[in-house]
Amino acid sequence: MTTQLEQAWELAKQRFAAVGIDVEEALRQLDRLPVSMHCWQGDDVSGFENPEGSLTGGIQATGNYPGKARNASELRADLEQAMRLIPGPKRLNLHAIYLESDTPVSRDQIKPEHFKNWVEWAKANQLGLDFNPSCFSHPLSADGFTLSHADDSIRQFWIDHCKASRRVSAYFGEQLGTPSVMNIWIPDGMKDITVDRLAPRQRLLAALDEVISEKLDPAHHIDAVESKLFGIGAESYTVGSNEFYMGYATSRQTALCLDAGHFHPTEVISDKISAAMLYVPQLLLHVSRPVRWDSDHVVLLDDETQAIASEIVRHDLFDRVHIGLDFFDASINRIAAWVIGTRNMKKALLRALLEPTTELRKLEAAGDYTARLALLEEQKSLPWQAVWEMYCQRHDTPVGSEWLESVRAYEKAILSQRG
């Protein structure tokens, strides 16, 4: 296999060199693009605060595949297993409900100490951490409102939760030497026709301003805000709409989060990246796969995933775009879900790096759209798979579908023993 891989690699280098692409440079650039894996795929967004509680906020994890992580130790072990099968740099994205404490902790009282184990684990595994306040699955979010709540005391609770979360995020960045991107998403909205659409947005605006009022070192912490079209139970009105957060991120110069599943099914976030970059300093991407709605299916190597990666690479947005994943499928092996989705994101980035973009730009500028289309299509047939397999080998990760054997062995030895 190694001989075949090396032969394919040498031939691929020649093929790409013929169109002006240095594959070694492409692999070096790929190592500059970490993908932030989301912890919540491992336990269906249960968390450790109240793991038997129901998931709320208009989101759903469907399926009942056996072996989900039941505590932090199991979740970290599962993550390590997945990460061993994914080449290149990675980060981990945590939600506040994944804190660890011997006694119950109110969400407005979370502290860095409740995430110390995650930081030590991240250090040991050379990972950066990202963070999210958890404004769902809680008695004070049960009526569908959090940061835009009309009740001052409830709204203040969620403001304090987000402020506490920012301090946790800054702790991550300080300890790990890489800024933590903290994304604020809230489920606030209404099921049916809404008469007053303005007041909740006014309250959300003021609440967010209070949340980000404490100045934190941008070398440690980055604020991001995330819109959504609708959620289950909030079909008619979402307070934090695209227009609201685009305006907020632009006026406050925070990062803007674009989630692939949070728009109308005919919209794609790949087309929004270049527009948003004109107005906001940084973007956070939640790469997902919506099937008819924000279903959070496992990411495929499909046209939209490729288009997202191509936008990042074509416009040299390496230092301004943070790539995160957001899906949770409980109907398949959860470790396999991580591996499939993350490897697909990295494959898309590699394919983008292997594109003869300079030549394509020249053709476009010259108005030769025939040649542009022809070259775009022909480059799809170039042997990028051989380059990917070499990348996997250099990072001591399985080539092709060999990783599935490792997942099956782990499932038999570990996952099958869980209740």
Swiss-Prot record:
A GO CC term assigned to this protein in UniProt: cytoplasm
InterPro entries, per database record: L-rhamnose_isomerase, Rhamnose_isomerase, Xyl_isomerase-like_sf
GO MF: L-rhamnose isomerase activity; manganese ion binding
Main location, first listed in the record: cytoplasm
Keyword Metal-binding included in the entry's annotation: yes
Catalytic activity: L-rhamnopyranose = L-rhamnulose
Function in brief: Catalyzes the interconversion of L-rhamnose and L-rhamnulose.
NCBIfam families: PRK01076.1, rhaA
Quaternary organization: Homotetramer.
Protein's UniProt name: L-rhamnose isomerase
Species: Escherichia coli (strain SMS-3-5 / SECEC)
